[in-house]
Amino acid sequence: MRSSHVNKKKEDIRMNDRIAVKGLVISNDEIFRGYFTIKDGTIIEVGESSPGCEVIDMGDQYITPGFIDLHIHGIHTYLIDNGPDDLSAICRILPQYGVTGFLPTVAPRPKGEDALFLARLAEMKTAGTEILGFHLEGPFLRITGALGAGAISGADVERVHKLIEAAKPFSAIFSVSPDVEGIENLIPLMAANNTPVFMTHTAASVKETQKAIELGVRHATHFYDVFPCPSVLEPGVRPCGAVEAILADETVSVDFILDGVHVDPVAVKMALINKQNGTGKVCLVTDANVGAGLDPGEFTFGNMGDISFAYKGAPARSVKDNTLAGSGLTMDQALRNAVNWLDIDLPHALKLVSLHPAQVLGIDHHKGLLSAGYDADFVVLNNDLGVMQTWINGKCIYNKDKQINRK
């Protein structure tokens, strides 16, 4: 049972109670003034007429599906790579940014240590934002980026098996580079049981990328970031590589760090056009690091040493060499950036942080929408799209005003 920031016993919601939530409901492409009814942590009815039970009235505030972050390393002063205690703290903090589910993203460690560390994280009992699997950013990468030398490893079938086992009962979701030698022997193992496999940190050719997709890779994380062009082969001819192969394939989804630095908004607009008709969609992630959500300052990030933020929401950079090292973005700010920068309406922007990530994970039959049969994971936003409340499995986990208007 997850804890609630609503402390008064008379305001606790027992899971067996039927209760309705009223406000400006947003689900899929619709905004309507209405209700949805919750029982046992599940939405059982959605409509515009009163359901005849106790109602929590959100007034003129928006009620949206909960946000899902597919790529996050840390927040505030906490870093997943510091261990279970920091992971537990992150789960408690994320609801204030509207995040109801996430993939804790683990940086690579030396062989042997990585599986032991992952097993410690997986057995941790947490309260707050729901863990939906573990995202392993490495070690099967071609380009290190800010992850250090541990991100580089040759194909190792035994290592993959051990990491998959260590993550249980969760899924181990690997980010790999299609241009790692022998990766074709690993992708089918990683993709077993319909587990998504991501690609990133790559300068792969079109053929290498297409082969990875054929073997089961269906998503590209922090797209464009650490996706350099292959070497120019013909003077005057723009080289094509992983970016173009991914954009051309309607089955592959992508995610972006929409902070205004990692990627130009025009590139996100281009992906929205390319991905509008296929099964592959566009998502937003934070790739957040220690310091995200806090005022500018310097923080310590594992092997990178000290990192700094020039302004709130900015990318993290190594103090030593100015290398990009994740971001200071939060999911609510990513949503606001999408509305302000991408020329899309609020329902469309919400899909980038809720339904589309759920589709990537294959859980869109019960997460990502406010619809009958779905988990009661939702966020209450004010007119400025600031997070006022976050509910997970039908319970209020974060409440900025510490009050609930019951009728």
What are these regions (language model features)?
Residues E165-D295:
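Active-site core of metal-dependent hydrolases
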Residues Q61-Y62, L70, I80-E130, A151-A166, ...:
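Alpha-helical scaffold segments that flank or form the walls of functional sites
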Residues G23, G41, D60, H71, ...:
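Divalent metal-coordination and catalytic microenvironments
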Residues R238-F256, I273-T286, A292-Y374, F378-V380:
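His/Asp/Glu-enriched, well-ordered alpha-helical/loop segment
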Residues G23, Q359, L369-K407:
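C-terminal cap of metal-dependent C-N hydrolases
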Residues H73-H76, S88-F117, T129-I143, K168-D179, ...:
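Divalent metal-dependent hydrolysis catalytic cores, especially in the metallo-beta-lactamase
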Residues R92-L103, I143-K168, K211-S253, D295-L324, ...:
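Active-site gating loops and adjacent loop-to-helix segments of metal-dependent hydrolytic enzymes
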Residues S3, D12-I19, L24-T64, Q403:
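Histidine-rich, glycine-flanked metal-binding segment
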